[in-house]
Amino acid sequence: MRIVVFLLSFIRCFSFASQSVTFIHKNSLKTVEGQRYKSGLLYSAPNSKRTLHIVTLDWPPYISNDLCNKGWVYHFAVAVLNSQGYSVYLEFLPWARAVRNVELGKADILMPEYYIEDTAPSDYVKNKMRRELLGISNSFQGGNIVFLKRKNAPGIFTGNLISLKGSTIGVERGYQNTPEFDAMMDNEEFKVISAVNDLQLMQLLFAKRVDLIIGDPSVLAHSVTFSELNQNEKIKLLNAVEQDGKPLHYNSLYFAISKLTPNWLEVLDDINQALYIFYNSGETDRLINTVSEECAV
């Protein structure tokens, strides 16, 4: 019987949780079903103003096409926009390609994004800053950014970024971390080795190719736990690293809107209004808690 219950829960999770989004709006429970569309899912709103194309990445445990319910940020994005009358076409892409598509106007919204500084240059539009190409929403819940080191290795980060000078640090390609850290990186005050994903970052640290890596600890741990490594390799890798010093920063998350999207300022205002409503009504926390527990068996 327990096996049957487990299988039913497993099938239900993959068949339904990943296809529908449920949220509370104006004291009413709303459910919107996702329909296969192009290379993603389309969530249609009644009397839709228009369809907005969101591009995102696999970034578990926040959001991933491989999570049983795609993660709370996925549900949150659909709910926020649907509550404002927008249909949503949501597509998973490699991060660098997602950034490129939104900056070039091939998609409307990039999320979840960290705060983008005015001085951050675009990698895809020559002589342009990213903020010239993208509008940034108000913030929503994110996570800490920390340095990880090998266990038993001397601590490097003292709380002052100056302590990083001369070190070799692993970073994920295309990510912004903090303005101060990124400025030091651009000035080559420490050596950088880029990784294509969080698992590769962890492996760089384990292999002693870098002194530290920077990232969200929950994302880094998840990248190992749900990788294709065998169980012994996972345990060995996770047990070999630890946080170096206090968190560097708490990074909130944002929606980034292409300024090539028609009436992008109106879309930005609608998103900010929904963020305010969701936060003050408690719907943001409810969604996070509900979706995070949804696939627990």
State where each predicted segment sits:
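A ligand-binding cleft/hinge motif common to bilobed small-molecule-binding domains
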Residues: 113-128, 211-249
